[in-house]
């Protein structure tokens, strides 16, 4: 195993914690949930502590977000950020149930490596 991507604490370098968020769209709101998630990308791109972020579609009305952070502080900043605030404002209109937000710990990961400029 290449241990260069593993930190001293045994977790993947650069990533130690994450969030898995499940979103169930109200009937007829599926497209709006998709649009909301796509529009969230620029907001997340402005968060330096969000190492990776994915908007997901599990099925016709089932969506999610998976994101990872270097540490708990980065995760807390994200949870207090603009995407979380926007989701809080729109959840009652867009979602059939409250979002399920599950904190997760990263056991292993493969992230893109920075390439040297030629």
Predicted regions and their residues:
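Short coil/turn motifs at secondary-structure junctions
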Residues: 26-28, 58, 70-72
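Intrinsically disordered, low-complexity acidic/polar segments
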Residues: 30-32, 74, 110
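An amphipathic, aromatic/His-enriched active-site/gating alpha helix that lines ligand/cofactor pockets
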Residues: 39-52, 68-102
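Generic anion/oxyanion-binding catalytic loop in active/binding sites
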Residues: 22, 42, 64
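Short, surface-exposed ligand-recognition loops at beta-strand->loop->(often short) alpha-helix junctions
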Residues: 23-34
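Active-site-flanking beta-strand signature of metal-NTP-handling nucleotidyl enzymes
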Residues: 16-24
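Glycine-rich beta-strand-turn "strand-cap" elements at beta-sheet edges
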Residues: 1-15, 51-63, 86-118
């Amino acid at each position: 195993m290449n241990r260069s991507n593993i930190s001293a604490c045994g977790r993947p370098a650069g990533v130690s914690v994450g969030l898995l968020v499940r979103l169930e769209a109200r009937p007829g709101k599926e497209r709006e949930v998709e649009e909301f998630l796509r529009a969230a990308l620029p907001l997340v791109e402005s968060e330096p502590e969000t190492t990776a972020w994915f908007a997901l579609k599990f099925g016709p009305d089932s969506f999610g977000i998976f994101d990872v952070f270097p540490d708990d502080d980065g995760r807390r900043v994200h949870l207090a950020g603009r995407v979380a605030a926007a989701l809080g404002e729109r959840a009652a209109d867009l979602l059939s149930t409250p979002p399920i937000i599950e904190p997760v710990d990263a056991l292993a990961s493969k992230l893109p490596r920075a390439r040297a400029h030629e």
